């Protein structure tokens, strides 16, 4: 990657050439998960022997849809403030003027935004951080975070800058100001993302997702598309319209996986503990004209209690849990993984498990239990964050049939 800050800025920690990075990630993943892929010593019927890890590469530049920058007055000079990132290998910040891993529209806005921040003291006074969020359709949210209260004078100036940026870049820009316990939204805090799956094939379909400031969303839309295609293709080979059944999703968020999978299942019972994420999921359902997703505000343990009828939840009073015929479960846990044996043993009740992991080490631990009842049907390695050592994995597991 051609970046003047490569090896200096700590945003990118892997400075090898991209093909070497990807091969190293593949080799390490293969080494760690070999026992789950090599079936020679297993007493189960498997489709292939051994199973290959499917590797999905990212664009090397211009792939990241969000960024978090800091500012420090230490870097003030005659040309003004710069964005700042943590230094590579050191506990201090370094100034940067550009970031090639960002989507092109975010790269374009960085120098323009810096110009305005350096021009107006009202904008840069006690400015602490800046978050950027974009869609592939070039709509942008700029969040400016301050150690001061923001008044009507700030709002008037920020609105003026917002309009000038929109005119210059010919796209929708939304500036948000944040200070302690306050959020100033000048126009909107939600943008639209259109993702097309299986482009230029008979299966091509486009979905619309709302992305909200401060809410989690997939940072690499190119890899996200490949992740969705991977899961949809795997499940489409298992489930057909002639075999209608339902899916349970734990940690569904705002529906990144839920929305595209709705066409495969009769119903999806989508559970999530964050109330605002469920609200966004409902917006995504309406936008995509989907009616067979049933959201519920439950954590993983509450979901298990509800489905086992161990506890009655008032918030589920209008949902008939007995009407579901679950065959598949999708779980996208935090970096800490599932961990809890009670949840893992509960997952073993489903014929199909889709496990989305952002931490191979916790995935490895969880598979030690899940592999007692299921085999790995497909294993995908997704390079969500090029130029880092991060690895994203998706494992499709099917219930095993012992050979008698």
Curated annotation (Swiss-Prot):
It comes from the Bacteria. InterPro entries: MeTrfase_TrmA_AS (IPR030390), SAM-dependent_MTases_sf (IPR029063), TrmA_MeTrfase (IPR011869), U5_MeTrfase_fam (IPR010280). One of its GO terms (cellular component) is cytosol. S-adenosyl-L-methionine binds at residues 218, 251, 256, 272, 332. The keyword Lyase does not apply. Belongs to the class I-like SAM-binding methyltransferase superfamily. RNA M5U methyltransferase family. TrmA subfamily. This is tRNA/tmRNA (uracil-C(5))-methyltransferase. Gene3D superfamilies: 2.40.50.1070, Vaccinia Virus protein VP39. The keyword Repeat does not apply. The gene is trmA. Its EC number is 2.1.1.-, 2.1.1.35. It catalyses: uridine(54) in tRNA + S-adenosyl-L-methionine = 5-methyluridine(54) in tRNA + S-adenosyl-L-homocysteine + H(+); uridine(341) in tmRNA + S-adenosyl-L-methionine = 5-methyluridine(341) in tmRNA + S-adenosyl-L-homocysteine + H(+). It holds the Pfam family tRNA_U5-meth_tr. Dual-specificity methyltransferase that catalyzes the formation of 5-methyluridine at position 54 (m5U54) in all tRNAs, and that of position 341 (m5U341) in tmRNA (transfer-mRNA).
């Amino acid at each position: 990657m051609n970046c003047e800050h490569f090896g200096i800025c700590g945003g990118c920690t892997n400075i090898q050439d991209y093909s070497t990075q990807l091969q190293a990630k593949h080799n390490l993943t293969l080494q760690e998960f070999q026992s789950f892929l090599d079936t020679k010593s297993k007493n189960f019927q498997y489709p292939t022997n051994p199973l290959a890890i499917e590797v999905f590469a990212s664009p090397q530049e211009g792939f990241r849809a969000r960024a978090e920058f800091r500012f420090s007055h230490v870097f003030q000079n005659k040309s003004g403030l710069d964005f700042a990132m943590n230094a590579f290998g050191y506990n201090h910040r370094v100034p940067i003027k550009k970031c090639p891993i960002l989507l092109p529209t975010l790269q374009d806005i960085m120098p323009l935004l810096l110009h305005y921040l350096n021009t107006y003291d009202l904008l840069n006074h006690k400015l602490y951080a800046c978050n950027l969020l974009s869609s592939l359709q070039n709509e942008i949210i700029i969040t400016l975070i301050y150690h001061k209260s923001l008044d009507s004078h700030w709002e008037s100036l920020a609105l003026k800058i917002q309009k000038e940026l929109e005119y210059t870049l010919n796209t929708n820009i939304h500036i948000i100001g944040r200070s302690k316990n306050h959020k100033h939204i000048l126009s909107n805090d939600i943008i639209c993302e259109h993702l097309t799956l299986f482009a230029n094939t008979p299966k091509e379909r486009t979905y619309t997702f709302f992305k909200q400031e401060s809410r989690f969303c997939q940072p690499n839309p190119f890899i996200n598309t490949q992740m969705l295609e991977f899961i949809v293709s795997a499940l489409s080979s298992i489930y057909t319209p002639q075999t209608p059944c339902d899916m349970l999703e734990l940690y569904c968020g705002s529906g990144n996986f839920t929305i595209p999978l709705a066409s495969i299942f009769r119903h999806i019972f989508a559970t999530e503990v964050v109330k605002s994420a469920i609200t966004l999921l409902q917006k995504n359902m309406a936008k995509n004209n989907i009616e067979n997703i049933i959201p519920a505000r439950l954590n993983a343990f509450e979901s298990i209690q509800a489905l086992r009828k161990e506890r009655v939840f008032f918030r589920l009073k209008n949902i008939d849990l007995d009407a579901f015929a679950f065959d598949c479960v999708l779980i996208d846990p935090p970096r800490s993984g599932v961990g809890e044996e009670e949840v893992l043993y509960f997952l073993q009740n489903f014929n199909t498990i889709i496990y989305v992991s952002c931490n191979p080490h916790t995935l490895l631990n969880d598979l030690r239990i899940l592999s007692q009842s299921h085999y790995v049907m497909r294993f995908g390695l997704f390079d969500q964050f090029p130029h880092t050592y991060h690895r994203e994995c998706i494992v499709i597991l099917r219930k095993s049939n012992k050979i008698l």
